[in-house]
Structures are given as C-alpha cells and as structure tokens.
C-alpha cells in the first residue's frame, strides 16, 4: 500500500500521464474527520476512486505538410494517419475528389498553421503502409481526431486493437449526424439499399439491409443478406460485438467499403460502431 499527500497530488497526476506507471492505476481518495486527505491503492469504506488514465504518451512533433483530412507528413518525412477516423479522399492520379475531402483537408491545415502537434499512439503504432498511427493534439490540448468528427468532416473508423477514445469518437459522430453537419447532409453519403449495390460504389458508403443468416469459416463470420451480398467480421474481433444472432431479421445500417469478387459483394466490418440497428 502507498499513500500520497494532498499537496503532492498534482505532481502525481502529471507523472501518471508522462511516464509508465510502475504501481497500481486504481487510486482511492479518503478524508478523515480533521480534513486530512490521503490517496491509496487500496479501497476502504470511506474512500472513492480517482480516475487515472494510465500509459498515455504524447510526443511533440512538427508538421511539414497536410496530405489530406486524415493524414499529415512530419518534418522527418514520416506520414501520420489519424486514428479512429476516416475523411473523404482528395484528388490524385488514381481518383477524383470525394465530396467533403477538400473541406476536411483545409480545416486541418487551418488547425496546424504553427506546425506543432502532439502524437498519442495506441496499441498498434504503424500500419501496413508504414504510416504512423496516432491521435493528434494541439499544444492547447485540442483533440483533432475528435474535432474532425464533431464538425462532420470525418466518420468513425475504429480498427482493433486500437480502441483508445472509441466512446468519445462515436459520441462525437452521433452528435454531428444528428445535426446533419458536413458529410451527414451530403447526398453522396445518404444510405442506399444493399439490393442496389454495384461496382460503381467507391469509397466509404452507407447501406441498409436485413441479414437473413450467419455463415462461419476459419477466419471470418459472415452476416448474409442475399446470395450476392454479405458483411464479414474477423473471428478475432467477434468479442467486441453482441451475439450476431442479435442482428438477424432486423434492419441494419452498414458503414464501410465494398469489395467485389466476380458478382459477389462484401463489406469488412471491424467494430460494432459500423453496424447500426434501425
């Protein structure tokens, strides 16, 4: 057991954010009859738990360029992909602008005019494209990933095991959607029936449909909508979802990217935030 006096609490909390904790992260506050406050790692009948966010690291970097609404390039040339979100693509030699892509990029450029940003990583720090994965913060503490969602400039895209801030991100999206901000008011991102899915559907999309059966193999479990359309969930992520039978026979909105194999269409779902019961 350890105790921390009241006047040392601020220093303790600062260290909790800046360095790895080498002791328990459940901290309890208690106060005696004379008003003396102590903090302990052991609960008592009179104590209450103090919420501590452990193992959160933020490192200062300098941005050289904004690639698009969810990717920045640091001074050392490394690309950083913002975690937990997706913004529409911007024009390059392979594709045209997606609606809302330029607006997201311009917004991020305006936020990063002084080029200073703090990076906070999660469980997986780099993707298959060798990009760093991070939550971005301004020096004043503004969470840019979250703010993009709040302004309707991005959509939630949570990929396990990077689940940090998932609840806050989902809530921000729900509020922007409710207010029809940004992309939530754009015709290109309104839900369409899965029965109308085609190879013309590119980028992030919203679909509606009712699953009728479940099929499982070694790697994926699939919710089947008809003989040409399914959504698939990696079996290693199933614990994040309610029992998939919960979805059977119920209208769903599905959010994600369509892949095609011959005349069959499939949408890979990583997190239950992409499946919304209607």
Feature names for model-found ranges:
Residues 1-7:
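Positively charged n-region of N-terminal signal peptides that target proteins for export
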Residues 2, 23-278:
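Small beta-barrel nucleic-acid-binding modules, primarily SNase/OB-fold domains
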Residues 8-9, 32:
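Sequence-pattern detector for short linear motifs
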Residues 11-20:
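Bacterial N-terminal signal peptides
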């Amino acid at each position: 057991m350890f105790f921390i006096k009241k006047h040392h609490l601020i220093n303790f909390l600062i260290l909790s954010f800046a360095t790895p904790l080498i002791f328990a992260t459940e901290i309890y506050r208690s106060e005696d009859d004379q008003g003396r406050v102590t903090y302990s790692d052991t609960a008592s009948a009179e104590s209450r738990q103090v919420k501590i966010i452990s193992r959160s690291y933020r490192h200062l970097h300098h941005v050289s360029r904004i690639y698009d609404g969810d990717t920045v390039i640091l001074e050392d040339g490394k690309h950083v992909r913002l975690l937990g979100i997706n913004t529409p693509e911007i024009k390059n030699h392979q594709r045209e602008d997606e609606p809302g892509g330029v607006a997201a990029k311009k917004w991020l450029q305006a936020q990063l005019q002084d080029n200073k940003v703090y990076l906070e990583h999660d469980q997986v720090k780099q993707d298959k494209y060798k990009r760093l994965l991070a939550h971005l913060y301004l020096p004043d503490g503004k969470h840019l990933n979250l703010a993009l969602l709040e302004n309707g400039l991005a959509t939630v895209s949570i990929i396990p095991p990077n689940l940090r801030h998932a609840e806050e991100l989902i809530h921000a999206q729900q509020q922007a959607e409710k207010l029809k901000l940004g992309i939530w008011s754009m015709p290109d991102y309104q839900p369409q029936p899965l029965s109308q899915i085609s190879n013309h559907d590119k980028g992030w999309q919203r679909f509606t449909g009712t699953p009728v059966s479940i099929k499982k193999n070694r790697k994926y479990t699939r919710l089947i909508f008809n003989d040409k359309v399914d959504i698939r969930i990696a079996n290693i992520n199933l614990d994040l979802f309610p029992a998939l039978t919960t979805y059977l026979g119920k209208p769903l909105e599905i959010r994600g990217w369509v892949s095609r194999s011959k005349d069959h269409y499939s949408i890979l779902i990583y997190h239950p935030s992409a499946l919304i019961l209607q």
